[in-house]
A protein has these predicted regions:
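Conserved N-terminal segment of class I S-adenosyl-L-methionine
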Residues: 1-169, 178-182, 247-248, 268-276, ...
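Short aromatic-enriched loop/helix-cap "lid" or pocket-rim segments at secondary-structure transitions
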Residues: 20-21, 30, 163, 206-211, ...
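Phosphate-binding active sites in nucleotide-utilizing proteins
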Residues: 174
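A short glycine-rich, Lys/Arg-flanked "PGG" loop and its adjoining helix->strand segment in the class I
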Residues: 179-194
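Short, glycine-/aromatic-enriched active-site segment of Class I SAM-dependent methyltransferases
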Residues: 197-224, 229-234, 258-260
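Membrane-proximal basic amphipathic "stem/tether" segments
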Residues: 212-214, 252-309
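Substrate-binding/catalytic lobe of Class I Rossmann-like enzymes that use SAM or dcSAM, i.e.
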Residues: 229-261
C-alpha cells in the first residue's frame, strides 16, 4: 500500500478524513479511505493500492472494457451514445485548436480509440494513442490500422515529439503521479500545444447528492478527485495555464448519476446491462430536460489549457 504524506497540489500536510467506501464495479468488502486537503480541497485515496494489485479491478467484465456490447440487444444505442461523445470532443478541438494535416494529436489513455477514429474522419492530422494495455484495440486491429497505437507510458514519449494537441479523457484521475505526467507533457510540447483534460468534478451536483456513493470515486481506480480551483493550481505548477473550463464536460452527466444509483442498489456489474436499458433511457431523458435550464456541473468538467510561454 502506498501512503501519501502531503497534498500533491499545494504540498499541504493538513488533510482530513472524508469518507470510506468499497470497490465500485467490483465484488468485495474491503474498504478504502479518501481524504481531503484542508487548503485546496483535493480529494485523494489514501493509502493507494499498488499498481500490481490494481489489475484485480480491471477484469474482462469491467464495464468500460465491455463497451456497447454490455447492453445486449441495445448495443446500437450505446454505440450511438459513444459516437455523440466523440463528436462533441472533436467539435471542441475544432473550436479551440483547428487541427490540420500538419497537426499531431496525441490521446493519453486511448482505450478503445473511437475518439481518434472520429478525428481521422474529420481531420487530416497524424493520430497517436497510448495506453498501458492494448485491451481496447487488440481485437480490432484492422479497424484502427490508420491510427498509431502503442502500449507505452507517458515517460516513454520522446522529447522531440511536439504534439499540437494532447487529450486526456478521464485519464488524470487514474494517474498515480499527475505532477510528473503534466510536467513531462509540457516538456515535449511546443508553444502552440493545447491540452484537453476531462475529469469528474468533485464540486458537481451529483457528488453532493450521492456523497460516498458517488460513482466519480470509482474506488479504488480513481486516486484523485479534482475541482476547478485545485486542477488550475496543479496545471500552473507543471507548465500549463487554463484557457477555459467547460463545466458540463463531454459525457452525458446522467451516466454518473445512474452509476451512483446502481452502486447503492448493488448491481452486479458483470451481468448484461440489457435489462437496465429502459430504466436508464427514461432516467436520461428526464435528466436531459432538467439540464436545459442550468450551466452548473452535474458530473464532469473539461479543462482546456496552453503551455506557459516562458517554458521551452
Amino acid at each position: 500500500m502506498d501512503n501519501l504524506k502531503e497534498c500533491i497540489v499545494c504540498k499541504n500536510k493538513k488533510t482530513t478524513y472524508l469518507c470510506s467506501n468499497t470497490a465500485m464495479m467490483h465484488v468485495g468488502t474491503k474498504e478504502f479511505k479518501f481524504f481531503i486537503c484542508e487548503i485546496c480541497n483535493l480529494v485523494f485515496l489514501n493509502p493507494r493500492i499498488s499498481k500490481d494489485q490494481l489489475k484485480e479491478y480491471y477484469k474482462d467484465f469491467y464495464l468500460p472494457y465491455r463497451g456497447p456490447s454490455a447492453w445486449g440487444k441495445y448495443q446500437k444505442f450505446a454505440e450511438l451514445s459513444q459516437k455523440r461523445v466523440d463528436d462533441r470532443r472533436t467539435k471542441m478541438l475544432r473550436r479551440y485548436s483547428s487541427p490540420d494535416k500538419e497537426s499531431i494529436i496525441l490521446d493519453i489513455g486511448c482505450g478503445n480509440p473511437t475518439f481518434l477514429e472520429t478525428c481521422n474522419f474529420f481531420f487530416e492530422s497524424s493520430l497517436y494513442g497510448i495506453d498501458f494495455s492494448d485491451h481496447g484495440w487488440k481485437k480490432e486491429k484492422d479497424r484502427f490500422k490508420m491510427l498509431n497505437l502503442e502500449v507505452r507510458d507517458v515517460d516513454d514519449l520522446k522529447p522531440n515529439f511536439s504534439p499540437h494537441i494532447i487529450t486526456l479523457w478521464h485519464y488524470l484521475e487514474h494517474d498515480y503521479y499527475p505532477n510528473k505526467t503534466l510536467s513531462k507533457l509540457a516538456s515535449i510540447s511546443n508553444s502552440k500545444t493545447k491540452l484537453y483534460i476531462e475529469v469528474p468534478n468533485y464540486n458537481s451536483n451529483s457528488r453532493k447528492k450521492f456523497n460516498e456513493n458517488w460513482a466519480g470515486f470509482h474506488t479504488p481506480r480513481h486516486t484523485f478527485l479534482f475541482s476547478p480551483k485545485n486542477i488550475e493550481i496543479l496545471l500552473n505548477n507543471n507548465g500549463w495555464e487554463i484557457d477555459f473550463i467547460e463545466q458540463k464536460g463531454t459525457i452525458n452527466p446522467y451516466i454518473l448519476t445512474w452509476m451512483s444509483e446502481m452502486e447503492i442498489k448493488g448491481l452486479n456489474w458483470s451481468d448484461s446491462m440489457e435489462n437496465q436499458f429502459l430504466n436508464f433511457f427514461c432516467g436520461m431523458i428526464k435528466h436531459k430536460f432538467r439540464q436545459l435550464f442550468t450551466n452548473i456541473s452535474d458530473g464532469n468538467m473539461t479543462v482546456i489549457a496552453k503551455k506557459i510561454d516562458n517554458l521551452s
